A protein has these predicted regions:
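Active-site lining segments of carbohydrate-active enzymes
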Residues: 1-53, 57, 63-66, 157-174
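Extended polysaccharide-engagement surfaces of secreted carbohydrate-active enzymes
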Residues: 49-233
Length: 233
């Protein structure tokens, strides 16, 4: 935001370069630019390469910066579609109660509504076919009592669509029957997404960043409850 406010174009481009194209890592310390972070730190479907409890914070900060640039003429989401995928990927690995797997060393995370609203905004802007599925997800989360759009505050007022478009996919594209999170070799099987009648199983245990907490483990979902690993927060 500070860089975008600079009137001197040379200075503005210099500071924006640290986000857009310039890495500053020396001896393991520094900052990665968006192109490098997108290449190294995201799975092909947009999951941050750490357990789900770590996903929302770094992704939300990258998206906040991307939205500022989008509002100033930079087509960041068009150039880096992985950011859009990262905005809603937690839904893909969610149980029917809309909590996600607790693999690794964090508690059980949820889809960030701020990120989902950003995904809806950009999918609407670029008229992407994923938009109806994202709108369906927002409605499901509202009906489940996990989101009240009227209380989104200044962020909602300044950054979200004034109203959600009327669209319905009629399909559950975000909740496939089988999924694999590649970097963690985490596998899931899903039978329905109804919070009471849906069933789901998650199995994982490969060696990866932050997997010192669980070892080989399994999570089972049924009758509205997840049974299995819970490493805490």
């Amino acid at each position: 935001a500070a860089a975008l406010s600079l009137k001197d174009a040379r200075k503005r481009n210099f500071y924006l370069g640290f986000y857009l194209n310039r890495d500053t890592v020396v001896d393991g310390c520094g900052q990665l630019s968006l192109p490098t972070a997108s290449k190294l730190w995201f799975t092909p479907d947009g999951h941050w390469k750490e357990p789900g409890g770590y996903h929302n914070y770094p992704v939300s900060k990258l998206i906040e910066a991307a939205l500022m640039l989008e509002n100033n003429g930079y087509q960041i989401f068009n150039q880096y579609p992985i950011l859009l995928k990262a905005s809603y990927v937690m839904l893909k690995y969610s149980f029917p109660d809309l909590t996600a797997s607790a693999f690794g060393d964090t508690g059980r995370p949820r889809q960030s509504m701020e990120c989902l609203e950003s995904a809806i905004l950009m999918a609407d802007k670029y008229q992407l076919p994923i938009l109806p599925d994202l709108l369906d997800a927002a409605i499901i989360l509202e009906r489940a009592g996990q989101y009240d759009r009227s209380k989104s505050g200044l962020t909602g007022l300044l950054c979200y669509l004034p109203e959600l478009p009327k669209a319905k996919s009629g399909d559950d594209h975000l909740w496939n029957r089988s999924e694999k999170l590649d970097f963690a070799s985490c596998y899931l099987q899903r039978n329905g997404i109804d919070s009471q009648d849906g069933l789901m199983c998650v199995v994982q245990g490969a060696t990866y960043n932050h997997n010192h907490s669980n070892g080989m483990s399994m999570e089972l979902y049924g009758a509205g409850t997840v049974q299995g690993i819970d490493p805490g927060n």
